[in-house]
């Protein structure tokens, strides 16, 4: 990321947002990048003072950025820039607010892609089948020398060095088998939880073990703006989570270094090296599962869309789904009613004789 002479102002603005707006770390990072890119462009044009920037300059910046970015990205960039100049004006850094009338690009209301209920079932069935196929009982290393007493009696004349060399590959295979099983259990739990709750992938990877309440079958979710909500989940998700926590998680936790283990001690989901799983791995898990299940390629966010649509199809109230998804606006949740209507029209066309 290019640095600018305005970095100090950007830092102050981001600190202000962090303290007063409760925005997520990802949003703050995006705003910082947007502002740095914007002000760097003006710097290249010879601007040395924020007071030199006009509304026409900002419109010119938008025209340049629009060539390479989607409207949704431009909407976020515009919000960041408008917020920055409003803050600068309020704090006496500028004599006017050139961005006060800067218009946010309109975003077309597109229907989110979703799986059908049967496709979602197929996706989860494949993940469950992978757990059964890769099932390997891990004993924490206690059985590494199983049968070694008899072997020692028969081969007493062999050197200890020879025995150790012959046992090493078996121990390595055992560790690999246990890891594959653990990852299958983790993947199944991730897919079940994403579909059962409709949570965002960022919310999933930030979850701790303590956020799960098995007695009430609910999870505590920390969403955008650090807002918390409680979301229920069903029996299939409970079973998958219990299997992961009791059998799979301990296996992956043992692969971590002490430093990683300390940082990920409370994490619900772990990566192959025992650290807290990141969003990229979670997305890969969903994409790979979709390929293996033979359903349309989807992202974790599309799985969230699917969950919301299926819950509404089942008769849930729109306000309840809004609360479950953590939407601040009911308008955002209403998109899923449009999807449900489209699916209803499709089913109507297939089933009704006078369609």
Curated annotation (Swiss-Prot):
Every Core-binding (CB) domain range: 4-89
Extent of Basic and acidic residues compositional bias: 168-178
Location of this chain's protein in the cell: Cytoplasm
Keywords noted in UniProt: Cell cycle, Cell division, Chromosome partition, Cytoplasm, DNA integration, DNA recombination, DNA-binding
Family matches, as PROSITE patterns: CB, TYR_RECOMBINASE
Main localization of the protein described in the UniProt heading: cytoplasm
Biological processes per GO annotation: cell division; chromosome segregation; DNA transposition
Active site (record annotation): 200, 224, 301, 304, 327, 336
Domain Tyr recombinase: 158-349
Pfam family, one: Phage_int_SAM_1
Record GO terms (molecular function): DNA binding; tyrosine-based site-specific recombinase activity
InterPro entries: CB (IPR044068), DNA_brk_join_enz (IPR011010), Integrase-like_cat_sf (IPR013762), Integrase_catalytic (IPR002104), Integrase_recombinase_N (IPR010998), Integrase_SAM-like_N (IPR004107), Tyrosine_recombinase_XerC/XerD (IPR023009), Tyrosine_recombinase_XerCD (IPR050090)
Record CDD domains: INT_XerDC_C
Amino acid composition bias (Low complexity), ranges on this chain: 141-154
Cellular component, GO annotation: cytoplasm
Region called Disordered, residue ranges: 138-180
Entry's family note: Belongs to the 'phage' integrase family. XerC subfamily.
Subunit relationships: Forms a cyclic heterotetrameric complex composed of two molecules of XerC and two molecules of XerD.
Task performed by this protein: Site-specific tyrosine recombinase, which acts by catalyzing the cutting and rejoining of the recombining DNA molecules. The XerC-XerD complex is essential to convert dimers of the bacterial chromosome into monomers to permit their segregation at cell division. It also contributes to the segregational stability of plasmids.
Name this protein carries in UniProt: Tyrosine recombinase XerC
